Regions:
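A short, compositionally biased
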Residues: 8-14, 113-118
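Bacterial N-terminal signal peptides
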Residues: 1-7
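Mature, soluble, non-transmembrane domains
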Residues: 64-69, 77-150
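N-terminal secretory signal peptides
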Residues: 11-76
Length: 150
């Protein structure tokens, strides 16, 4: 059903690896840009019903490739949405909504794909993965085999 999502199985390909968080059950491997591993998580705010987009980049450090939340785009004001920028962050008006620029380490990067939120992983090449179709349980997302920065 999702054959077009799977990257060819090569040992050194830069990939996002999605597994069930508690069991480790493999769900999918997705090819990434090895020089700039990044992906967006798009979803519908559970209370407001408005779109939210979280942008993540993976950076190499001594503990491996780890996700950093670098931007959040949203409309409206509601539970879980920022109302002000924290230290080192910038909250900017962006059309009808807002854009929060930040650099927050998210490790481990785990998402529970609630059906009402229609959580989607969006890759740079515009591939979209509906997370709730992969599993109803918490999903861990990690980058593997990407090129070290030069």
């Amino acid at each position: 059903m999702f054959a077009w999502l799977f990257a060819p199985s090569t040992a050194q390909a830069c990939e996002l690896v999605l597994t069930e968080h508690r069991t480790g059950r493999p769900l999918v491997r997705l090819a990434l840009n090895p020089a700039q591993p990044a992906a967006d998580v798009a979803f519908t705010h559970s209370v407001l019903g408005t779109p939210v987009l979280d942008r993540y980049v993976w950076r190499l450090d001594p503990q491996g490739w780890r996700a950093h939340l670098v931007e959040e785009r949203f409309e409206g004001e509601g539970y879980g949405l920022p109302s002000a920028a924290g230290p080192g962050e910038r909250l900017l008006r962006d059309g009808p909504g807002w854009r929060l620029q930040l650099d927050r380490l998210v490790d481990p990067f785990v998402i529970l794909p609630l059906p009402a939120q229609s959580m989607r992983l969006v890759l740079a090449d515009q591939r979209v993965v509906l997370l709730g179709q992969l599993s109803q349980k918490s999903i861990e997302i990690r980058a593997e085999n990407c090129s070290p920065p030069k």
